[in-house]
C-alpha cells in the first residue's frame, strides 16, 4: 500500500555542496497540525548528530499556497492549517560537505546520501501506520551518473517498504561503472568513487573482487544462502579517511586509495577485513538484534549492554572468515592480530571499565573520546574481540575442536533473528546458547566474567592452549650520538 509520501533530492548543483530536498505528503491528515522531525542517530553509529544543523532555506506549501514552517525543539518543524489539505510540500537545502561514510557528501563528481540526515519524517498529523507503507524516493542527478541503491525501482525513482528500509537505503551516484557479479545465485554490486578523481587500479580492483567472492561464499557456508538476492557495496577511496557503516543489504566503506595500489599489504588486509565486517552485519545487527533495538527509537539515545557482541563478535568472526575463505593467508591473520595486540596492550582501561559498561556508555565514551580516555576506557570492538577469542579457544578445547563461537553466532541467528517466533537477544540468550552447545556447558561463568568484570582477558593463556605463544617484538636500539 502506498504511503502517500514522496522523498526527493536534487544533486544537480554539485558545486554548491548543498542538496535540494523536498518531502511531499498527501492527505488525509489527522488534525490541523503536521510535525516532521529528523532522526537524531542511526543504528551502527551511537552518536547524536543533529542533522538539522545542516538544513537551510526551509519553505512549506499547502495545496500550492506558501505557508509558514515553524522550527520546533532541536529536531523538528511544525506546519499548521493542514486539516482539510490534499497535499503538503516541504522544501529545504542540506549541506553535504562532510566526507565520511556516515554523512551526506555532494560535489561535481558524485553524491552520497544518508537518508536519515536528508529527509525528515512525519511524527504528528498523519496516521502512524502510513510510515510502514511503501514510500517513493526520487533522485535528480547528472545524466551520466548511475546509482547504487538497494531498493526496487528504476534509475532515479525507487520504492522503500516502510520507515526502516527507507532510512537504510543508502544512495551513491556517480559516473563510474556499476560492477556486478554473482555468488551462489546472489547478485553483488560494487560502486566505487575516488575523492581525488584518480584512476582506480585495475589489478587491485580485480584482486578485491576475487577476495569479495571468497568472503561472501564463506558467509553463506556459515549462515546459509540468504533470502535477499542482491547486495550493494559502496567503496569510497580517499587520501587517508577510513570507516564503514552497515545498511540493510548494503554497506558504505571508506579506505585510503593505496589499499588497491600494489605494495600496500597492510591496507589491503584492512580493506578485505572492513568489507567482511560490514557484510557480516547483515546477520549480526540487521537480522539479529538486541531486544530493545527491534523497533528503533531514533529521537533519543537507546542504550545496549551488548555492543561487545554486535561489534566485538563481528570483528573477530569477520576476520576469521577472511582467513577461512582464503582471502587472507595465515600470515595475514597473524600480522593483523599482532597489530590488534599492540593496541590491546597499549592501554589500561580494562581495570576501570567492563565490556558491558563500555557498550552501555558508547554514546559518551567511544564516540566522545578525549586525550585521557585510554587510561580508564576501552573499545568494545577491540576488547570484545579479545573476549570472544578467549571463549572460542576454550569452547574448541572442550569440544575437541568441533565447535566454536561461530557456531554460537549461527545458532543465535537462526533462533532469534527478525521474523522468528522469539526475535531479539539479551545476555541471557547468548549465555543459554553458549552453554547448550557441545563443550560449552561450563562456560557460562567465563562469559559472565569476561563481559561483566573489569579485568583483562587472558589472551596469552588462550594462545598457549592453541599450541602458540605471543612473543614481544625485539626492541630496536636507538642511535648512539657519542654521549654517555
For each predicted feature, which ranges?
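Beta/coil-rich, acidic/histidine-enriched accessory regions frequently appended to metallopeptidases
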Residues: 1-4, 19, 418-484
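Juxtacatalytic substrate-recognition/specificity segment
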Residues: 180-307
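Extended, low-hydrophobicity, Ser/Thr/Pro/Gly-biased non-transmembrane segments
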Residues: 39, 61, 91-177
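Surface-exposed beta-strand/loop patches in extracellular or lumenal glycoproteins
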Residues: 19-52, 120-142
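Acidic/His/Gly-enriched intrinsically disordered linker/tail segments
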Residues: 288-296, 301-381, 416-419
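Non-catalytic, glycine-rich low-complexity segments
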Residues: 1-15, 22-25
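Zn2+-dependent metallopeptidase catalytic core
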Residues: 51-54, 132-149, 159-166, 197-231, ...
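A surface-exposed beta-strand-loop module
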Residues: 11-12, 24, 45-108
